[in-house]
């Protein structure tokens, strides 16, 4: 909700940000800029203005910090005289003003660079004329002028003995500062290049000692400490033991970076974000209290440096937790030669150095909130998530790294100018691609570099424990990669009906050929690989495989390779360029030859899984008897005749060893199915006069009601019927009340399918012509008597099954007014199913008419043909 701002309220920029407005204007802000707050448009965006009369614009609220409003200075209390007993000190009153950066003696600005801009400068050569109250153009540096006299201190110990700290309640009343974080925020450390004679001013709230009496001169002209960005600067403290727990701040929040998944910590009061946990000591520091002087400088510096190991680059670097400065170990040796360069060293790294990337603001965790931003004067091109790579690699020795316009990392060899592009597969694993020759590798080629100087080390380096070198990983190189057309024709010995040619990114690595899924952005003739690989679709192991040029009967395309794997699968690989497919043929053939040379030779006559297309064996074969081919037959055209004779011998031996069908049934490997089984065998196996499936279907249909419209005439879902058939064939326990078979037309369709799948219909082939001759009789009585006698001559399973079915259909006909199934309709449905000739005849239309008449007559004469017991 928008909120107006009363009075002059200013904000201080803490993080860089830029975006393009709807009018094309580029809005960019830098840290330590100060803008006037006009309106709090939303929770996430504020309306600000730089200069009076300037054009206003929007800024993200999390990237700026609201500065406290100015108040009238409080008169300083009179200094008190020391008493014999301790007394409670009077609280200090502060007024807040903005001062410009002091100008050095040479006329240049004394404002530090990089992260040092958050540190305050020394309080020297400062006059009242240098201060500007809310100057529009001056940098935002918070100036606190204590009303009580402050004695210059030469050391922290001296300050601790006689210093007076402002009460925590006074500091917390400023609105933006909290008493819980004062100890880690109110500090004014000296720059590294300044002399030790400079005054250090600190506010230490832990001390409650009475103030000392000051001279009149000190009261009239007190030194004025300057505090800049006080809430972001940690306090300079003496080195503590590793076991001492750090001081905790209860205002830290834990968030997760949506881009990398790494947790980071955010302070809502100060707006500070950090990768390192504020609740524990940094991990990986082997010597947290190692002095910066041990890196190569003999001076005693105020800050503490920790030595760390970068796992990805294998280099040692030093990190200062107080200033955030990070320096590589080899860079410190170069600084030893130039002391001035060392003093002016800025705490910044390459844009891709670990720890340099500022963590995102909490809005990155909740992208759905971005829709609530104002639509007035900005176009969120530079959104919070567009902060660049969060975990880039450091360039190895001998390589330089830069970001291309496509936001890809380009590594250039400093000696040969060879260039490699760093990409990532779908799992996030990085690899490198050479645009010149389209080669791909997991690692950059190693560049021989001179050994580092060992004589420049400081004597204090021996105190630091030796860093354990990372474990050596086996470098895997890609033999070949590119875009090819491929199709799979045989899947583990089973030939596929259709060939689907697709273009996919293909990678040959370590004896394994991987076909990734369709690449929408690549063509067969393209040289550029997809920026992000998809899921692997086929993986072919070249060990024991064979490769040959595909004959014309396999494919009409040109330049087609046929690859047969050891598990019996076959693939066709094609490319329009003959030169490219020839290089692939050479690379795959060399991989097969190299891997097959290590395979043990098989004895003559031993079967091979590659020969038969499957590793499944029957009979008395042992697992260790099956070994892949020692060499690919197709790679040696001269021995094709001998190979064919050897294959015939193996097939003959295999067929002789093949177990009989009866033995497989006895062992339970093969079970007779219900659908397609002879009716007599099924009844004998189930020990029932009528198949159980027929009984179940009839009971279920009658239980659900015979008044359903179109019963036995309307077809059910064919896919569901096939599922029911599979269930009946493979599972003895069938429950037709399951929700999957709730449609009654599925059950009636399965029952009709059962009778159609019988090897011999319910009216046997031997009785077909007799029934047709009987139905042609002109005398109705004689016709009925002849049909009844023929039905009684049917085999017992056929007779009993026909009795149950006809009686059920008669009950269906009784509900003909509701289900609209008359005798003629039922006869048309079941006539061709129950009665059909063994061989199709020329007069099929007339035969179908007689078939329907036979079933219709049996339905009319059901009580006479099948009398009740």
From Swiss-Prot:
Bias-annotated ranges (Polar residues): 345-356, 631-642
Main location: cytoplasm
Location of region: Disordered: 104-137, 275-299, 331-389, 447-474, 598-644
Membrane topology: Peripheral membrane protein
Stretches assigned to the SH3 domain: 6-69
Pfam families registered for this protein in UniProt: PH, RhoGAP, WW
Domain WW: 246-280, 299-333, 414-447
Chain ranges of the Rho-GAP domain: 677-866
GO molecular function: GTPase activator activity; SH3 domain binding
SMART domains per record: PH, RhoGAP, WW
Modified residues (Phosphoserine): 155, 215, 249, 350, 459, 462, 469, 632
Ranges of biased composition (kind: Acidic residues): 331-343
Location(s) in or outside the cell: Cytoplasm; Membrane
GO cellular component labels: cytoplasm; endosome; plasma membrane
Positions carrying Phosphothreonine: 464
Lineage top rank: taxon: Eukaryota
InterPro entries per record: PH-like_dom_sf, PH_domain, Rho-GAP, Rho_GTPase_activation_prot, RhoGAP_dom, SH3-like_dom_sf, SH3_domain, WW_dom
Alphabetical UniProt keywords: Cytoplasm, Endocytosis, GTPase activation, Membrane, Phosphoprotein, Repeat, SH3 domain
Domain PH: 477-593
Annotated site location: Arginine finger: 713
UniProt cross-references to SUPFAM superfamilies, sorted A to Z: GTPase activation domain, GAP, PH domain-like, SH3-domain, WW domain
Subunit structure: Interacts with SH3KBP1/CIN85.
The protein, known as: Rho GTPase-activating protein 27
Gene it is expressed from: Arhgap27
